[in-house]
């Protein structure tokens, strides 16, 4: 059975991207909008294209993604992570170039929580001797 739709999930900080790849012409639709419409004029478009260019599949798949959580920058990174994982589903041969480019690794850095008795995560209240 040949699968014509590939699904993967990408994450970054609090952003979660659910990504579906279908054979097509390279359209990227995010939350039922074009990427330029959703992210605005200035966004990291090269990050979305990087997984495709790494695996020589540029403009061979259409991307339909739903994004939620986080900010726009984290959402772009989550989308790139999801696309990379979906490309891995399309062809296991894509693993080596994607891994060498560092696109399969989830960036686990998240905001550190505020601690009680302190002003922030690491910042302390100002100390007064008297």
From Swiss-Prot:
Name of protein: Small ribosomal subunit protein uS9
Keywords annotated in UniProt: Ribonucleoprotein, Ribosomal protein
NCBIfam families in the cross-refs: PRK00132.1 (NF001099)
GO CC terms: cytosolic small ribosomal subunit
Keyword Ribosomal protein set for record: yes
UniProt family annotation: Belongs to the universal ribosomal protein uS9 family.
A Gene Ontology biological process term: translation
GO molecular function list: RNA binding; structural constituent of ribosome
Entries under InterPro entries matching the protein: Ribosomal_Su5_D2-typ_SF, Ribosomal_uS9, Ribosomal_uS9_bac/plastid, Ribosomal_uS9_CS, Ribsml_uS5_D2-typ_fold_subgr
């Amino acid at each position: 059975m040949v699968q014509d739709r590939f699904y993967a999930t990408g994450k970054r900080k609090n952003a979660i991207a659910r990504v579906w790849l279908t054979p097509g012409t390279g359209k990227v639709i995010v939350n039922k909008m074009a990427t330029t419409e959703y992210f605005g004029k200035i966004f990291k478009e090269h990050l979305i294209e990087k997984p495709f260019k790494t695996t020589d599949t540029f403009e061979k798949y259409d991307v339909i993604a739903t994004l939620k959580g986080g900010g726009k920058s984290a959402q772009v990174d989550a989308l790139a992570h999801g696309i990379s994982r979906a490309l891995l589903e399309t062809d296991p041969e894509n693993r080596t170039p994607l891994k060498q480019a560092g696109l399969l690794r989830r960036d686990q850095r998240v905001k550190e929580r505020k601690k009680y008795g302190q002003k922030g995560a690491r910042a302390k209240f100002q100390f007064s001797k008297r």
